[in-house]
Design a protein with these regions (language model features):
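Secreted glycan hydrolases and related glycan-binding modules that recognize and/or cleave
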Residues: 1, 98, 103-104, 204-206
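Conserved acidic functional residues
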Residues: 1, 66, 213
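Boundary/entry segment of secreted carbohydrate-active catalytic domains
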Residues: 1-20
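Surface-exposed beta-strand edges and their flanking turn/coil or helix-capping segments
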Residues: 3-6, 78, 199
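Charged helix-capping and loop-helix junction motifs
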Residues: 13, 44-49, 198-201
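Short, well-ordered alpha-helical scaffold segments within catalytic/effector domains
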Residues: 14, 98, 165, 197-198
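Substrate-binding cleft and catalytic face of glycoside hydrolase catalytic domains
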Residues: 19-183, 189-191
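Substrate-binding cleft/loops of secretory-pathway carbohydrate-active enzymes
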Residues: 185-213
Length: 213
Protein backbone atom coordinates (compact mmCIF):
# COMPACT_ATOMS: atom_id res chain seq x y z
CA UNK A 1 0.00 0.00 0.00
CA UNK A 2 2.78 2.41 0.90
CA UNK A 3 4.19 1.94 -2.61
CA UNK A 4 0.84 2.49 -4.28
CA UNK A 5 -0.04 -1.13 -4.97
CA UNK A 6 -3.74 -1.98 -5.12
CA UNK A 7 -5.59 -5.26 -4.86
CA UNK A 8 -8.51 -6.45 -6.96
CA UNK A 9 -10.85 -9.41 -6.88
CA UNK A 10 -11.60 -11.58 -9.90
CA UNK A 11 -14.32 -9.14 -10.96
CA UNK A 12 -11.87 -6.26 -11.09
CA UNK A 13 -13.24 -4.60 -7.95
CA UNK A 14 -10.66 -2.93 -5.72
CA UNK A 15 -10.29 -4.44 -2.26
CA UNK A 16 -8.12 -3.85 0.79
CA UNK A 17 -5.71 -6.80 1.04
CA UNK A 18 -7.11 -8.41 4.21
CA UNK A 19 -10.67 -7.95 2.96
CA UNK A 20 -9.71 -9.65 -0.30
CA UNK A 21 -8.32 -12.64 1.61
CA UNK A 22 -11.57 -12.86 3.57
CA UNK A 23 -13.52 -12.69 0.32
CA UNK A 24 -11.45 -15.60 -0.98
CA UNK A 25 -12.36 -17.75 2.02
CA UNK A 26 -9.58 -17.18 4.55
CA UNK A 27 -10.79 -17.01 8.15
CA UNK A 28 -7.53 -16.41 10.02
CA UNK A 29 -4.32 -14.38 9.72
CA UNK A 30 -0.79 -14.87 11.02
CA UNK A 31 1.29 -11.75 11.62
CA UNK A 32 4.92 -11.55 12.71
CA UNK A 33 6.43 -9.05 15.12
CA UNK A 34 10.09 -8.06 15.39
CA UNK A 35 11.83 -6.41 18.35
CA UNK A 36 13.28 -3.31 16.66
CA UNK A 37 12.78 -3.30 12.88
CA UNK A 38 13.69 0.39 12.51
CA UNK A 39 16.64 -0.53 10.27
CA UNK A 40 14.24 -2.42 7.97
CA UNK A 41 11.57 0.19 7.37
CA UNK A 42 9.72 -0.31 10.63
CA UNK A 43 7.54 -3.08 9.25
CA UNK A 44 6.42 -5.74 11.74
CA UNK A 45 6.84 -3.44 14.73
CA UNK A 46 4.15 -3.68 17.40
CA UNK A 47 2.48 -0.63 15.86
CA UNK A 48 2.41 -2.22 12.41
CA UNK A 49 1.18 -5.45 13.98
CA UNK A 50 -1.74 -3.65 15.60
CA UNK A 51 -2.89 -2.08 12.33
CA UNK A 52 -2.95 -5.48 10.62
CA UNK A 53 -4.70 -7.15 13.55
CA UNK A 54 -7.35 -4.44 13.69
CA UNK A 55 -8.16 -5.06 10.04
CA UNK A 56 -8.51 -8.77 10.71
CA UNK A 57 -10.67 -8.25 13.78
CA UNK A 58 -13.00 -5.95 11.84
CA UNK A 59 -13.54 -8.84 9.43
CA UNK A 60 -14.10 -11.37 12.24
CA UNK A 61 -10.92 -13.28 11.40
CA UNK A 62 -8.94 -15.23 13.99
CA UNK A 63 -5.46 -13.87 14.74
CA UNK A 64 -2.09 -15.54 15.29
CA UNK A 65 0.86 -13.50 16.59
CA UNK A 66 4.30 -14.75 15.54
CA UNK A 67 7.13 -13.59 17.83
CA UNK A 68 10.49 -13.78 16.04
CA UNK A 69 12.53 -12.44 19.00
CA UNK A 70 14.86 -10.78 16.52
CA UNK A 71 15.11 -7.41 14.78
CA UNK A 72 14.51 -9.10 11.43
CA UNK A 73 13.76 -12.49 9.90
CA UNK A 74 14.35 -15.50 12.16
CA UNK A 75 14.56 -18.97 10.59
CA UNK A 76 16.55 -22.22 10.94
CA UNK A 77 19.67 -20.60 9.43
CA UNK A 78 19.66 -17.54 11.68
CA UNK A 79 17.98 -16.50 14.91
CA UNK A 80 19.95 -13.32 15.47
CA UNK A 81 19.72 -11.79 18.92
CA UNK A 82 18.14 -8.30 18.90
CA UNK A 83 20.78 -5.57 18.92
CA UNK A 84 19.47 -4.09 22.16
CA UNK A 85 19.83 -7.46 23.90
CA UNK A 86 23.34 -8.18 22.63
CA UNK A 87 25.86 -9.02 25.34
CA UNK A 88 23.21 -9.77 27.94
CA UNK A 89 23.49 -12.80 30.19
CA UNK A 90 21.07 -15.70 29.98
CA UNK A 91 19.05 -14.41 32.93
CA UNK A 92 19.01 -10.88 31.52
CA UNK A 93 17.87 -12.16 28.16
CA UNK A 94 14.99 -14.06 29.73
CA UNK A 95 13.94 -10.76 31.29
CA UNK A 96 14.26 -9.06 27.88
CA UNK A 97 12.16 -11.78 26.26
CA UNK A 98 9.43 -11.58 28.90
CA UNK A 99 9.33 -7.78 28.82
CA UNK A 100 9.09 -7.67 25.02
CA UNK A 101 6.39 -10.33 24.92
CA UNK A 102 4.27 -8.66 27.59
CA UNK A 103 4.77 -5.21 26.07
CA UNK A 104 3.53 -6.30 22.65
CA UNK A 105 0.61 -8.34 23.97
CA UNK A 106 -0.51 -5.64 26.40
CA UNK A 107 -0.40 -3.16 23.52
CA UNK A 108 -2.75 -5.43 21.57
CA UNK A 109 -4.97 -6.05 24.60
CA UNK A 110 -5.26 -2.34 25.38
CA UNK A 111 -6.45 -1.83 21.81
CA UNK A 112 -9.06 -4.58 21.88
CA UNK A 113 -7.13 -7.39 20.19
CA UNK A 114 -7.00 -10.94 21.60
CA UNK A 115 -5.00 -13.46 19.54
CA UNK A 116 -6.30 -17.00 19.28
CA UNK A 117 -2.75 -18.35 18.87
CA UNK A 118 0.69 -17.05 19.86
CA UNK A 119 3.98 -18.42 18.53
CA UNK A 120 6.99 -18.34 20.85
CA UNK A 121 9.72 -18.11 18.23
CA UNK A 122 9.70 -18.70 14.49
CA UNK A 123 10.94 -21.90 12.81
CA UNK A 124 12.80 -22.86 15.98
CA UNK A 125 14.11 -26.27 14.90
CA UNK A 126 17.56 -25.08 16.06
CA UNK A 127 16.22 -23.01 18.94
CA UNK A 128 16.14 -19.22 19.02
CA UNK A 129 18.15 -16.28 20.37
CA UNK A 130 21.42 -17.39 18.81
CA UNK A 131 23.34 -15.43 16.20
CA UNK A 132 25.35 -16.08 13.06
CA UNK A 133 27.86 -13.99 11.17
CA UNK A 134 25.76 -11.78 8.87
CA UNK A 135 26.30 -9.23 6.12
CA UNK A 136 25.21 -5.59 6.23
CA UNK A 137 21.72 -6.57 5.06
CA UNK A 138 21.22 -9.09 7.88
CA UNK A 139 21.58 -12.22 5.74
CA UNK A 140 23.84 -15.01 7.04
CA UNK A 141 27.32 -15.25 5.55
CA UNK A 142 27.98 -18.79 4.28
CA UNK A 143 31.26 -20.52 3.51
CA UNK A 144 31.96 -22.46 0.31
CA UNK A 145 30.10 -25.45 1.76
CA UNK A 146 26.99 -23.45 2.58
CA UNK A 147 27.65 -23.40 6.32
CA UNK A 148 27.19 -20.42 8.62
CA UNK A 149 29.33 -19.34 11.55
CA UNK A 150 27.53 -19.19 14.89
CA UNK A 151 28.72 -16.17 16.85
CA UNK A 152 26.44 -16.60 19.88
CA UNK A 153 24.86 -19.96 20.70
CA UNK A 154 22.97 -19.12 23.90
CA UNK A 155 19.54 -20.37 22.78
CA UNK A 156 20.71 -23.02 20.29
CA UNK A 157 18.66 -26.21 20.67
CA UNK A 158 21.64 -28.53 20.14
CA UNK A 159 24.41 -26.49 21.75
CA UNK A 160 22.43 -25.20 24.73
CA UNK A 161 19.20 -27.21 25.04
CA UNK A 162 18.49 -26.12 28.61
CA UNK A 163 18.68 -22.46 27.67
CA UNK A 164 16.51 -22.96 24.58
CA UNK A 165 13.86 -24.57 26.78
CA UNK A 166 14.29 -21.83 29.36
CA UNK A 167 13.68 -19.15 26.76
CA UNK A 168 10.59 -20.96 25.51
CA UNK A 169 9.22 -21.43 29.02
CA UNK A 170 9.74 -17.73 29.71
CA UNK A 171 7.86 -16.81 26.55
CA UNK A 172 5.05 -19.23 27.35
CA UNK A 173 4.56 -17.79 30.82
CA UNK A 174 4.67 -14.22 29.49
CA UNK A 175 1.98 -15.01 26.91
CA UNK A 176 -0.27 -16.64 29.49
CA UNK A 177 0.15 -13.73 31.89
CA UNK A 178 -1.60 -11.47 29.37
CA UNK A 179 -3.83 -13.89 27.45
CA UNK A 180 -4.43 -17.03 29.55
CA UNK A 181 -6.87 -18.43 26.98
CA UNK A 182 -4.64 -18.01 23.93
CA UNK A 183 -3.07 -21.14 22.46
CA UNK A 184 0.73 -20.89 22.81
CA UNK A 185 2.58 -22.72 20.06
CA UNK A 186 5.94 -24.22 19.19
CA UNK A 187 6.62 -23.30 15.55
CA UNK A 188 8.80 -25.72 13.59
CA UNK A 189 9.31 -26.08 9.86
CA UNK A 190 9.49 -29.34 7.89
CA UNK A 191 6.31 -30.94 9.18
CA UNK A 192 7.27 -34.19 7.43
CA UNK A 193 10.40 -34.67 9.59
CA UNK A 194 9.39 -36.81 12.58
CA UNK A 195 12.96 -37.00 13.90
CA UNK A 196 13.16 -33.20 14.00
CA UNK A 197 9.93 -32.95 15.97
CA UNK A 198 10.89 -35.76 18.35
CA UNK A 199 14.22 -34.05 19.03
CA UNK A 200 12.99 -30.48 19.40
CA UNK A 201 9.88 -31.21 21.43
CA UNK A 202 11.90 -33.68 23.48
CA UNK A 203 14.40 -30.96 24.35
CA UNK A 204 11.58 -28.71 25.50
CA UNK A 205 9.78 -31.45 27.44
CA UNK A 206 12.91 -32.84 29.10
CA UNK A 207 13.95 -29.38 30.26
CA UNK A 208 10.65 -28.37 31.81
CA UNK A 209 9.03 -26.29 29.06
CA UNK A 210 5.38 -26.66 28.10
CA UNK A 211 3.21 -25.65 25.16
CA UNK A 212 -0.40 -25.89 24.03
CA UNK A 213 0.12 -26.78 20.36
Amino acid sequence: ESKGYKFYNKNGQERECTALMKELGLNAVRHRVWVDPSAHGGWCSKEDLLVKCQRAKALDMAIMVDFHYSDWWADPQKQNIPASWSGHSYEQMKEDLAAHTIDVLMYLKDNGIEPKWIQVGNETRNGFLWSVKSNEHGWPVMDENGNTTITESMGHAMNNPEQYAGFFATGYDACKSVFPNSIVMVHLDNGFDKDLYDFNLGVLRDNGAKWDM
